[in-house]
Regions:
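Short, conserved phosphate-binding/catalytic loop or strand-edge motifs used
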Residues: 126-127, 145-151
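Well-ordered alpha-helical scaffold segments within catalytic/enzyme domains
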Residues: 152-156
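Single conserved hydrophobic/aromatic residue that forms the stacking wall/gate
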Residues: 1-13
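Amphipathic, small/basic residue-rich leader segments at the start of a protein or domain
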Residues: 12-142, 161, 165
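Internal maturation/activation junctions in enzymes
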Residues: 146-147, 158, 162-179
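Structural beta-strand/beta-sheet cores of well-ordered domains, especially the beta-sheet scaffolds
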Residues: 28, 108, 150, 175-177
Length: 179
């Protein structure tokens, strides 16, 4: 609550308090180990190759991109919000390049089905990434949120023809969900 109040004052007064964020990778790994044992991930065929070392590597890379690339965008987005000009939405400076890196590095596909180009990680792993992304820059995270919703809706309710047409494009970040 206090952070939010300070941030609103800084925005209003045109000063800026630069937030810091250190992803809690060790805490996340502790939770993953507990869930892995309780949920028996290692007994599920689709998660046989999901080891603690692999998850730790993923989370460490996720921490780097969120701390080094996404976190600085929080200030940029606050000072230069998205605008609608002549029917075209202009995102804050740096968002387009960051989103391109975000999709190139495969962050859109963490828990998506490998059948459609996803990595097939447990939802727990993508939840950890989402927590990091939300903490680094909630406004940036919201750019991908509609795509996650569209993916889940199509994956759970559409015919195979629709899934085959739309899901690979959503997973690779070429298409996104809209409202």
């Amino acid at each position: 609550k206090e952070y939010r109040r300070q941030r609103q004052m800084c925005i209003r007064d045109r000063t800026y308090y630069m937030p810091s964020y250190t992803a809690p990778v060790e805490d996340m790994m502790f939770l993953f180990e507990k869930l892995r044992n309780n949920q028996k991930y290692n007994e599920l065929e689709k998660y046989k190759e999901v080891t603690s070392d692999l998850v730790k590597d993923i989370l460490q890379e996720a921490a780097k991109i969120n701390q080094n690339l996404i976190l600085p965008l929080a200030k940029v987005g606050d000072e230069n919000p998205a605008v609608l000009e002549n029917g075209v939405v202009r995102t804050p400076p740096g968002y387009k390049e960051a989103y391109k890196k975000y999709i190139e590095d495969g962050w859109t596909s963490l828990s998506c089905d490998p059948k459609y180009g996803g990595q097939g990680m447990p939802k727990t792993v993508s939840a950890f990434f989402d927590e990091m992304l939300s903490s680094a820059s909630l406004s940036f995270k919201l750019y991908s949120e509609l795509s996650i919703g569209a993916y889940n809706c199509i994956n759970h309710h559409a015919t195979d023809d629709i899934k085959n047409k739309y899901l690979p494009k959503i997973v690779e970040g070429k298409w996104s969900g809209t409202m």
